[in-house]
Amino acid sequence: MDTLHHRDPGVVGGGLTNEGVYVEFIPDLLHLNKDILKLIVLAKGEDKCIIVTDSLCATCLKKGMYRLGDQHVIVTDNGARLKNGALAGSIIMMAEAVRNMINEVGIDPVKVLKMATLNPAKVLGVENYLGRIAEGYDADMNILDWDFNVERTILKGRCL
């Protein structure tokens, strides 16, 4: 992707300044610095931001080497990287992404949860039954503790 440059804002600048565009980002603090994450939220507002994980098949697995198609992915404390050092994708879980946005970036928890729930539902066109806790909506949710760890998952109103 083109970078943001002061003389040529490119795709990034267009996404940040076009009010009709939602912006998706991976808040693993590897793909984007916490100050850039804050800049995105300030530029777009909570209604146009979507938290994604882009998690690879190596998510939740031990450190080591894994395959992604025909490429080798090395998982370390520094994320999932290709042999040349480039990021291969993310190994972050959504609860950690939410935690990073709140604890590291400093965004209000209510705004962060909207970016992880209702906003994606709107983009997918399912906001009439997903994305919030309300009468008539599917009761799909994760119950988090005060450190934003998943304690329980509820799907269609049933505890898993």
Segments the model singles out, each with a brief description of its role:
Residues 1-5:
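Phosphate/pyrophosphate-binding betaalpha-module
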